[in-house]
Amino acid sequence: MMKKLILMAVIATSMTAMSCAGNSENNANGSDSTAAEQTAAAEVDPAAWPWDFPQSTGEQLTDGQLVLAPYTYYKVAIDDKEDLTRKGLIFYNTNLKKAGAQKSVVNFKEDYELPNSLIIGIPEGATAKKGDILLTWWQQGSGLRRAIVRDDSNPAEPLVDYLDSRMEIDPNSPTNFAEKYANSPLKPNSFIVLHDGQWEPGVQVACKNSRGEWDAAKLIKATDDKVLVLGFSDRVAVYPKSDCKLIPMNSEGLKPGDKVRGLFVATYNEEYTVDKVDTERGRVWVTNDRGKQEVKSVLEVTKVLD
C-alpha cells in the first residue's frame, strides 16, 4: 500500500512539472507577444497619442531616410500641451536620425521620438511615367502635395503639376498657383508613385462622419479596420475603414455632363456637373447648382459616393 502511495505521488509530481513546463513554453511562444502589446498600450501617453490607432503599422524605415512627417508642429503642440486632435499637423520633408520599431528619432531644435504612424517613408530610386500621380512635397516651398506627371523625359526627375495647388478659371489670377508652378521639376528620390485602389499613404479618401457627410482627407496609414487621415485644416483623425472610400485618381471615367460630388470646404457634399476634363493635367471644370463654375483636381470630384 505504501509503495502505491509513493508511486502515485511521484506521478502527480511529474505531471505538475510537465504542466508548468508547458505553461512556460506557452508563455515564451504566445503570451510574450500579448504582454508586449499590453506593455506598448500601457506606455501610450494620451496627450502625445490621442488617436485610437496603432503608433506603428510595421513601417520599414531606415536611419537617415527621407520622410514626410509633421515633425515641427507635433513637437510644438506637445511642448505647449495642446490638444493634438485640434492642432493642424503639416507634413514636411525631413530625414530620420534613427529608425525604431514603434517610434523614430527626428530633430526639431533637439532630437525627439515621433510615432511611426505619423511618418511616411520615401523610397530611393523611384521613377514615374506621364499621367502618374505622386506623393511628394511642394519643392518650391514646403508641405505635403500630390502631383501629376506632365513630362517623363527623365523618369527619376519628372515635371509635374501640383494637384493640391489651387487652379482658377482666370489663368492670370494672382491666386492661380497651379498655373504659376506648372511643369515643376521634382528632385530624384523625392516622391512615391500612388496607385488607384490601394490603401497607401497619400491617396485621397472620403469618410462618412456622424452627420452622414463625406469628409475629404488624405490617407496617412491604414490597418485592416481603421484609417489614420489628414483632414480639414491638416488635423489628424481616425475613422473606421468601412466608413471610407478611396477616391479614384483616373479622370478618364469622367466626361462632360456627368453629375458628380465635388469637394467644397471640407466635404464632398456639393453636387456639380462636369463641363470639361483635362486628363493630362488632372483637372476638371465643373458647375454647381447655383451656376458657378470652378476648376477642381481629379482628387476633388468623384462619382463613387452616389
Label every model-predicted segment:
Residues 1-2:
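N-terminal secretory signal peptides that target proteins for export/translocation
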Residues 5-13:
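Sec-dependent N-terminal signal peptides
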Residues 16-19:
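C-terminal motif of bacterial Sec signal peptides marking the signal peptidase cleavage site
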Residues 21-44:
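Short, low-complexity, disordered segments immediately C-terminal to signal peptides
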Residues 41-306:
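Eukaryotic chromatin- and chromosome-associated nuclear factors
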